A protein has these predicted regions:
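Active-site neighborhoods and metal-handling regions in enzymes and metal-associated proteins
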Residues: 1-256
Length: 256
């Protein structure tokens, strides 16, 4: 059964989403050559816990050891923070984070360049952002999950890129993951219908190369099978009668 949220519940999620947006903004500012992914994870957890009522949603979830999923270059998602993973000039780092606030969850991700990146990596980032925007715009009452997926896939395929196999968006709200799934491909008017009050994570994961993926021996990190780079952007979105409401776009003010 699909869970729908009241306007009051959506407002609570938006407050958590604002904390999440601020966390990603803070993390992006810390990204630089020489920093480890573990150091970024520590910054994220400390920043989240500095906001009353907020805590990292991913830490310990299904046994995940970090607070943030931090994935580099060909790593698509679920990279485990490590003191041995050091960012280098030209890397693409994906920062994927969830917040639990007053018992409600939000989920968001960004891709950040480490210093100067090559033109194709920049194009990958731009296309993935555009695909997310197209998916969000399709998250309207009366549409279906297939409309979101079709909108994302149209942007990605036009650029000559692919969406990662078997990795999809999902319901988020009273729990961090659930149904309906929100694939990054689809046929308009197919899949579960979007109703007012539905809250979902829309998250295109886009590869320069082929769509095939594999999981590393750590049983968490998912990478492109051909070693090509991947980008990831994600928002938590509420479907409302007034149109899609992005809950993770506007950060709370950050103290100097």
């Amino acid at each position: 059964m699909i869970s729908l949220k009241s306007p009051r519940e959506i407002d609570i999620m938006a407050r958590g989403g604002a904390i999440l947006a601020a966390t990603l903004e803070r993390l992006a500012a810390e990204v630089r050559p020489g920093i480890t992914t573990k150091a970024l994870d520590v910054v994220a957890e400390e920043f989240i816990r500095s906001h009353q009522g907020a805590k990292p949603a991913f830490k310990g979830l299904y046994g995940f050891p970090g607070s943030a999923c931090i994935s580099i270059n060909e790593e698509i998602v679920h990279g485990i923070p490590s003191p041995k993973r050091v960012l280098k000039e030209g890397d693409l780092v994906k920062l994927d984070f969830g917040v639990e606030f007053e018992r409600y969850f939000t989920d968001s991700a960004i891709t950040v360049p480490v210093g100067h990146i090559d033109a194709e990596s920049q194009r990958l980032m731009d296309v993935t952002k555009a695909a997310l925007a197209a998916g969000v715009d399709a998250a309207r009452v009366g549409n279906h999950t297939g409309d979101i997926g079709a909108a994302i896939a149209s942007v990605v395929s036009a650029a000559g890129f692919t969406t990662a196999d078997d990795l999809v968006g999902h319901y988020v709200g009273s729990k961090p993951h659930g149904d309906p799934q929100v694939p990054n491909y689809g046929i308009p008017k197919r899949g579960p219908k979007l109703l007012a009050g539905l809250t979902i994570a829309i998250e295109p994961m886009v590869n320069i190369g082929k769509s095939a993926t594999r999981t590393l021996k750590d049983k968490w990190t998912i990478v492109t099978q051909d070693g090509s780079r991947s980008a990831h952007f994600e928002h938590t979105v509420a479907v409302t009668e007034a149109g899609p409401r992005v809950l993770t776009a506007t950060p709370v003010p950050v103290a100097p």
